[in-house]
Every structure is written in structure tokens, then in C-alpha cells.
């Protein structure tokens, strides 16, 4: 391991000792909030410090085995020990680096999932409907809730646009790599010549903002409009201005909600989407700066970036960011996304590890 990582592990080991002393004092145990905070910190750093202790012990064992190898009587035994200790060190180092990787603070959050039809006309809208069903099925498998925030259905089925809130522990960590352009290749039902058509949709995955900590908006920067809902919902759509549109004037970002009967609830939901979009814009600006010096293996997450192709005639799905092709399109479209999500997460982690070891 390089010196920077060794220094970091040394600091964490010292901090663990400090925390043990603090947590045993009456002053800390009497302050429940502080006690919980320090206990959480200890729980976070203890596993990696334990690994580092094991790493140091194996290093000592390796040094002893090397000394023994100079004695002809123990050479064969020592060389076997040296090989075993080297393997142990490699495995422990990999796990240490994995635990030192920076945690994404948004990973455990709920998300807003936005799907928009792109090129391809009616077929694109139908594909947007397929993607919505795919993510909804996946959420169902994970035990998550799906709430429709707003929708613009197509006349032929599917959606020109649909925005949903997915509520579930770890939703962002599993779906954050879905942002980007999704392309479908298939024969439309209306195609009489059997020709394959290509259509596209864009997907955006935004972590739901913390209601208190993440962002504060100046009311003077907001324009709030109410209007009559144009979608499903019953007779009330012609009687009340329950739909709400909020515009953030400094950025021009807009969010609206018309799914609920209550203007108050629609306003709250639209505000949540607006904040998520503003934060997403800030994060993507930061990522663009970082990408100028290092391009992520799993792509930039830009909405225009084509990330995946769904080829129905060949029964395959290809993720272009990691060159992964799976011949199980029916299962994936039915919500079996684990293999794809896990492969993308693993590639992202590998890129982070590579960056860490280069420092």
C-alpha cells in the first residue's frame, strides 16, 4: 500500500483509540445525542482498523518467514509461508481499499425517476412505457413503493413523459447509473414490412433531497402557478386548479405535479422534484469538472449520452459503458435488473480503487 493510505489508516487507528476513551467518560455517556454520534463514527471506522491490524500482523509473519527461508532446514516450509502470506496481504489490501472508498451520501435515499420519449415518435412513447414498467417491477421486487408524480400519456399508449418517486432504502445506490439515453431496436406492431425501427428515451435518476439540510430556496426566486389538471383523476379536473407548477427563476428549472386532488400535496411534491433537479444540476456541474481530468468508466450520466441498447430481434441488451451484453432481454424488461446494476456498481468501484492507488 502507498504511503498516503498507510497514513490514513494510522490516523483512523488513533481516532479509534480516542473514541474508546471518549465513550467511556461520564460527560459523553450523559449526552445521548453526542454518544450516539460518536458510537456511529466508531462503528464506521472499526472494521477497517481491524483489517489494518490484521494486515500488520501478516506483514510480521511474512518477515519471519523470509528470515526462516535462509535456513536450508526450513526453506521449503518458509517459501510456502511466504507465498501464502503474500496472497493474504493482497486480499486484505483489496478489502481495506474497498472500505476506504468514499461513500456516496445519497446512496440510501429515495429517488425521482424521470423517463422521457425521444426520437421515434409513437414507438418512443411505447418504449417509455416499457421502461416505466421495468423500473416499477424492479422496485416491486425490492419491496419499494412507486408514486406517480406527473405523467403525459401518449395517444397510442406509453408516455411522452412520466416522473415517479421511488421510496425505498438504497434506491439511489441501485439505480443511479440508469441516467442517460436508452435505445430500443424492434419491429413496431404497425410495421407491415417487418423492418426494425430504432427509438430512444432519456432517463434521469435524481436523489430525493433532505427536507432540512440540503438546500434552502429563497421564496422570491420562485414563481408558483396553479392550473387545472389535464390528466386522469375524475370530474375534479374541470372544477379546481389543483395542479401546481413551480419555476426556479435563477436557473429556469421547472417542476409540476397534477396527480393528486389536493393543491397543497401537489405543491409539496412539485417542490420536492424542483429541489432534486436543482441539486442534480449542481452535482452534474461538479462531475463535469472532475471528468475534465478523469472520465468515469460508467459514463458521465449526461442525459444525451447513449448508455444502453435494447435489441429485441436479437434478444439482447448491451450496456455501452462497460461493454456488457446480456441475452436475456425479456427478463430484464420484466424488472430483473440486479445483474446489470451490480455490474455497473462493480465497474464504478474498480475505477475508484484505481484512482485511489494512483494517488
Swiss-Prot record:
The modification N5-methylglutamine is found at residue 235. Keywords: Cytoplasm, Methylation, Protein biosynthesis. The keyword Mitochondrion does not apply. It is found in: Cytoplasm. PANTHER family: LD18447P. Methylated by PrmC. Methylation increases the termination efficiency of RF1. Its main location: cytoplasm. PROSITE patterns: RF_PROK_I. This is Peptide chain release factor 1. GO terms for molecular function: translation release factor activity, codon specific. Belongs to the prokaryotic/mitochondrial release factor family. SMART domains: PCRF. Coiled coil: none annotated. Peptide chain release factor 1 directs the termination of translation in response to the peptide chain termination codons UAG and UAA.
Amino acid at each position: 500500500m502507498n504511503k498516503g493510505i498507510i497514513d490514513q489508516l494510522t490516523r483512523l487507528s488513533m481516532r479509534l483509540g480516542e473514541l474508546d476513551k471518549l465513550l467511556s467518560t461520564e460527560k459523553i455517556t450523559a449526552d445521548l445525542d453526542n454518544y450516539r454520534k460518536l458510537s456511529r463514527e466508531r462503528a464506521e471506522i472499526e472494521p477497517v482498523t481491524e483489517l489494518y491490524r490484521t494486515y500488520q500482523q501478516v506483514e510480521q509473519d511474512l518477515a519471519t518467514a523470509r528470515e526462516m527461508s535462509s535456513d536450508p532446514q526450513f526453506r521449503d516450509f518458509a517459501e510456502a509461508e511466504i507465498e501464502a502470506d503474500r496472497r493474504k496481504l493482497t486480499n486484505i489490501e483489496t478489502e481495506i481499499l474497498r472500505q476506504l472508498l468514499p461513500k456516496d451520501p445519497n446512496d440510501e435515499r429515495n429517488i425521482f425517476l424521470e423517463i422521457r420519449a425521444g426520437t421515434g415518435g409513437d414507438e418512443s412513447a411505447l418504449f417509455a412505457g416499457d421502461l416505466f414498467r421495468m423500473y416499477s417491477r424492479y422496485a416491486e421486487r425490492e419491496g419499494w413503493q412507486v408514486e406517480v408524480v406527473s405523467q403525459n400519456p401518449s395517444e397510442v399508449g406509453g408516455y411522452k413523459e412520466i416522473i415517479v418517486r421511488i421510496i425505498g432504502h438504497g434506491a439511489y445506490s441501485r439505480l443511479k447509473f440508469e441516467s442517460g439515453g436508452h435505445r430500443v431496436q424492434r419491429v413496431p406492431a404497425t410495421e407491415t414490412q417487418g423492418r426494425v425501427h430504432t427509438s430512444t428515451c432519456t432517463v434521469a435518476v435524481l436523489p430525493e433531497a433532505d427536507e432540512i439540510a440540503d438546500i434552502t430556496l429563497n421564496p422570491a426566486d420562485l414563481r408558483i402557478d396553479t392550473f387545472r389538471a389535464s390528466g386522469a383523476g375524475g370530474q375534479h379536473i374541470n372544477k379546481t386548479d389543483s395542479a401546481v407548477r413551480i419555476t426556479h427563476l435563477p436557473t429556469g428549472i421547472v417542476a409540476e405535479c397534477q396527480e393528486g386532488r389536493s393543491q397543497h400535496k401537489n405543491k409539496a411534491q412539485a417542490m420536492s422534484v424542483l429541489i432534486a433537479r436543482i441539486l442534480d444540476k449542481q452535482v452534474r456541474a461538479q462531475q463535469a469538472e472532475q471528468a475534465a481530468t478523469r472520465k468515469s468508466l460508467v459514463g458521465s450520466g449526461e442525459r444525451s449520452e447513449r448508455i444502453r441498447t435494447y435489441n429485441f430481434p436479437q434478444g439482447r441488451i448491451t450496456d455501452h459503458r462497460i461493454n456488457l451484453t446480456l441475452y436475456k432481454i425479456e427478463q430484464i424488461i420484466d424488472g430483473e435488473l440486479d445483474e446489470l446494476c451490480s455490474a455497473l456498481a462493480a465497474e464504478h468501484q474498480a475505477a475508484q480503487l484505481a484512482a485511489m492507488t494512483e494517488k
